[in-house]
Amino acid sequence: MQSIILIGKPNVGKSSLFNRMARQRIAITSDISGTTRDTNKTQIHIHSKKAMLIDSGGLDESDELFKNVKKNTLKVAKESDIILYLVDGKLAPDDEDRQFFYSLKKLGKPIALVVNKVDNKKDEERAWEFANFGVKEIFNLSVTHNVGLDELYEWLEKFLHEEFLIPDEEENLEDFLEHYEEGKEFQFKEVDQNHIRVGIVGRVNVGKSSLLNALVKQERSVVSSIAGTTIDPVNESVVHKDKVIEFVDTAGIRKRGKIQGLERFALNRTEKILSHSQIALLVLDAHEGFNELDERIAGLVAKHYLGVIIVLNKWDKSEMDFDKTVKELRLDRFKFLAYAPVISVSALSGKRVHVLLDKILQIFENFTQKIQTSKLNTLIENATRAHPLPHDYGKLVKIYYAVQYDLAPPKIALIMNRPKALHFSYKRYLQNQIRKEFNFEGVPLVIASRKKGSKENDES
């Protein structure tokens, strides 16, 4: 697995970028220079490829401690595959940054200059000054506002080779391919179609308990205006159209710096509950607005590959425009959950809460959907005919056949001659075509490419 290291002087936003790329808060972030002194690392995925992301300590000669941090950082950089050097876009380039950057460039590894904190037009104009670093790969970012990351991800993806799959999915896929006979329908795992497990998640005081009470029409959880009233997870089941829907009301997730005692335990329970859920109701506060913590909680949902419905609670108090809000969520804040339906409700008044029950049944049906192999391959043939697969350095890239190998969530294998040549943008095109033909609203769609007649996903 390739590794990506974030390097730069203190307080340029390395930890914030690390948290953004990891979709969770791992490194401590602060306005105080040099908050991160130790090396943090975590596995991430960029589009369909996985990598190890490393957050180094800040490069600074101002004290003895940071001299050691710099020495360690350079050592880790030598062992890494890709280097991202961060600078502060609100400050003019300085010779110290150039010196650090050139010393890293000599390592002969893929390296990019990341200009962070480019938050407005004035910052964009100033960022051009960094062109004198003499590097082609310069990316202007605003990590705080989640702007500019798509271009960076596309550049990084070119250097990553190892395909990302859900944990344990690699073994499942290889086992499937070993026993699958081309052209035959596959016997899927049994999923109880009459019992649906739904996790209710969101930050503190967005109205999760009120929503649960409205859904089951009784006071089951303690409801209060005090942030974080609900600590213990509460299960409640309802029967809707002959289906049992089991709800789990999770304790609200606070900002990490405020988590103490029972609240920290509740955060761990929340992730555990998601791991046992099939569908998540991601509850947002439409009256108070959205923040970075909402995005991190959404990242937990995406991490578990659940069916998902985004619930805009307290809509009766909101002044937001619904269409503009949905566009903001899908194109900006929750791009990785762009397939999720968005429903506005008022849990306290019960308005539109009933819509959620029907939507849960629909999403669960999509979540457990089985695609007939012949129909899937007809779609793939038509899609590749309309937009042929790009050649790989002059060599033909072919998809021999496609087959769904799992459900809940649905997973599709593309058997190819050159699986590594399948660019994420073409994979996304195929995903979009499949979503158009088959209803996968609210459901993640996993596509894995493999070499024909081999367990390997490469050219060897």
From Swiss-Prot:
Residues 369-453 form the KH-like domain. InterPro entries: G_ENGA (IPR031166), GTP-bd (IPR006073), GTPase_Der (IPR016484), KH_dom-like (IPR032859), KH_dom-like_a/b (IPR015946), P-loop_NTPase (IPR027417), Small_GTP-bd (IPR005225). Keywords: GTP-binding, Nucleotide-binding, Repeat, Ribosome biogenesis. Belongs to the TRAFAC class TrmE-Era-EngA-EngB-Septin-like GTPase superfamily. EngA (Der) GTPase family. GTPase that plays an essential role in the late steps of ribosome biogenesis. Associates with the 50S ribosomal subunit. HAMAP family: GTPase_Der. This is GTPase Der. It comes from Campylobacter jejuni subsp. jejuni serotype O:23/36 (strain 81-176). The gene is der.
